[in-house]
């Protein structure tokens, strides 16, 4: 005897009486007379109809119901079939309503009493009223994604833990990298009704603007916000004002403390990442440096001494930590290691590897013996790097616009569960191919939704 797979994935014994009961209810809804033998015959025809769809002794409840509709229609009971379809849709609406219904009391209590594992899911979210607000809105938004946006197969795969759709609590994209050069040239502004700043003329102003920019953009994205060539673009400001090392360090210190201040939803600090070149990249070396939105009479390549000052100041601040000696969580630095990297016993090298050994803070991009250059890659966050050479092959698109690049979302496939459920290696890869298609479809859907919301003005900055 075969079995039936329910909508929640559970397996139950097949019971033909349930088919007979459903058909009887469809007749009763129309107040249509029938003989019990007619119902039994129709139920038997249903089993014969769905028999070719049985796989490994299992038939899905959806296939059974599809067969009921077709058998009723072909047997001359089109009106009963229509009644059955309406009944089926009504039951589906009830199931969806129950699935999306949120108990406001449980929602608040689970956070306040720390009864829900999600309260401590993100180590950057402090237990606070801001975290409570984020938890409440996140639960609503997650249900909106699963019930109103994603198709049933995607939502079911997430709910059954076949895949995990990250950041369902946010109606936004995942992470983004921004052009620090564009910020230096244009500064903050361009949003109707909001304050617009002039391009920074001094390092202290630029550091404050970067803090504000990262805080603002973090509220429009779920994940990390990144700047590339941090030291290269800051160095001309040191040179233009002939700043001392102490003055430079004070400015960089204000930036580090600023990005570690809770300014994003959920009482969190902006998740920020910066890439430091260490050595001026070839694509910027001969370009005129920009300060105050204007080109200077020297190039970025002329600012090697100032780059070293910026790097030294940043590393020393990260090593020293805050007033209690606690290491800074942000920004997460990524250093480019190229053939030009100076491996000698310089002070900056010593400090760099001291910071690495003390906190394990920085990431290193190894370009030695690589066909890529630092300008080809943008580090978005701790787990994502984008190859700009691939993006350049794309024609337009919101996420393929030069240095301002990003990621639409993240989906994790539950590989251990997949392996456990697979009968053999071939079955494993068959299941994996299917889940990869489901995951890709979810990301495509999310991209369409976020792009539409962007065009509608939901992300003003």
Residue map of PLM features:
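Charged, amphipathic alpha-helical regulatory modules used
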Residues: 1-107
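Conserved catalytic cores of very large enzyme subunits
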Residues: 90-94, 100-461
């Amino acid at each position: 005897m075969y079995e039936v797979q329910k909508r929640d994935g559970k397996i139950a014994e097949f019971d033909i009486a349930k088919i007979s009961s459903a058909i009887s209810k469809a007749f009763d809804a129309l107040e249509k007379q029938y003989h019990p033998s007619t119902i039994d015959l129709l139920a038997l025809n249903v089993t014969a109809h769905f028999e070719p769809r049985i796989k490994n002794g299992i038939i899905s409840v959806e296939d059974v119901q599809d067969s009921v509709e077709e058998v009723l229609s072909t047997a001359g009971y089109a009106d009963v079939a229509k009644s059955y379809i309406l009944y089926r849709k009504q039951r589906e609406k009830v199931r969806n309503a129950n699935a999306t219904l949120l108990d406001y009391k449980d929602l608040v209590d689970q956070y306040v009493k720390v009864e829900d594992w999600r309260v401590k899911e993100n180590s950057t979210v402090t237990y606070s009223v801001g975290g409570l607000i984020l938890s409440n809105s996140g639960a609503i938004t997650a249900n909106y994604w699963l019930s109103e946006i994603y198709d049933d197969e995607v939502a079911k795969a997430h709910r059954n833990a076949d895949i995990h759709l990250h950041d369902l609590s946010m109606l936004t994209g995942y992470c983004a990298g921004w052009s620090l050069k564009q910020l230096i040239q244009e500064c903050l502004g361009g949003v109707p009704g909001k304050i617009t700043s002039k391009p920074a003329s001094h390092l202290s102003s630029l550091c404050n603007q970067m803090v504000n920019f990262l805080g603002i953009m973090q509220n429009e994205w779920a994940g990390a916000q990144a700047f590339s060539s941090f030291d290269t673009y800051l160095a001309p400001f040191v040179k233009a004002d002939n700043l001392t090392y102490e003055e430079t360090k004070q400015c960089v210190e204000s930036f580090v403390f600023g990005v570690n201040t809770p300014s994003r939803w959920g009482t969190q600090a902006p998740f920020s990442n910066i890439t430091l070149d260490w050595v001026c990249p070839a694509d910027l070396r001969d370009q005129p440096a920009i300060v105050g939105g204007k080109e200077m009479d020297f190039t970025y390549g002329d600012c090697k001494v100032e780059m070293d000052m910026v790097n030294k100041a940043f590393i020393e601040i990260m090593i020293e930590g805050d007033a209690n000696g606690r290491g800074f969580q942000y920004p997460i630095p990524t250093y480019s290691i190229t053939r030009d990297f100076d491996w000698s016993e310089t002070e900056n090298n010593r400090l760099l590897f001291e910071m690495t050994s003390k906190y394990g803070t920085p990431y290193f991009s190894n370009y030695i013996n690589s066909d890529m250059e630092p300008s080809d890659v943008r580090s978005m966050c701790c787990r994502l790097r984008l190859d700009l050479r691939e993006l350049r092959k794309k024609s337009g698109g919101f996420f393929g616009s030069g240095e301002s690049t990003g990621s639409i979302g993240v989906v994790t496939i539950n590989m251990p569960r997949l392996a456990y459920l697979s009968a053999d290696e071939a079955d494993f890869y068959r299941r994996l191919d299917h889940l990869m298609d489901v995951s890709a479809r979810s990301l495509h859907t999310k991209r369409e939704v976020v792009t539409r919301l962007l065009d509608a003005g939901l992300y003003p900055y």
